[in-house]
């Protein structure tokens, strides 16, 4: 389906993702988003009452959060290490797809108004909470040691986020001799040894 055939809401979201990725939240205007979406600015505001709500919907639609929610039913029945590897693989894939958005958000996040910082924090907290619930569920089944599941979720995603940032955003080739599968396998092995009973 071409952009012109997409429903208005989806067209606005796709255009917003593209412009936020190119110009950042601060640089992209609702006037520009509506024009490039082929709608009047008033139409944009009918779908998204504020620029903040539009940004929140872009994060909710195009980041790892919907992917994580979608894979959890399958991941919850996988063996532990396989489940961790699947989460990591999908996380890295999503980060690569959204590389430009991540780069621009890193460069301007210190300038964001509190409302936008709050949106980012709630999105990250929900993602970490889902993963923490996964660890808690596995612990209740007797598979894992007792540990702070929220910190473990942050550590787990943080390892792979740092791998992505150093290699894809900063351009350091510290792990140049490793492909994604090797990094995922190595990180998961280390992480699972620290958390498994």
Give a label for each model feature.
Residues 96-130, 177:
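Short secondary-structure transition hinges
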Residues 56-87, 130, 136-139:
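Amphipathic alpha-helical linker/stalk segments
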Residues 1-23, 27-39, 53:
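Basic, helix-initiating cap at the start of DNA-binding domains
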Residues 38-48:
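Short hydrophobic/aromatic patch on the recognition helix
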Residues 9-10, 30, 52, 77, ...:
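Short, structured helix-loop boundary elements
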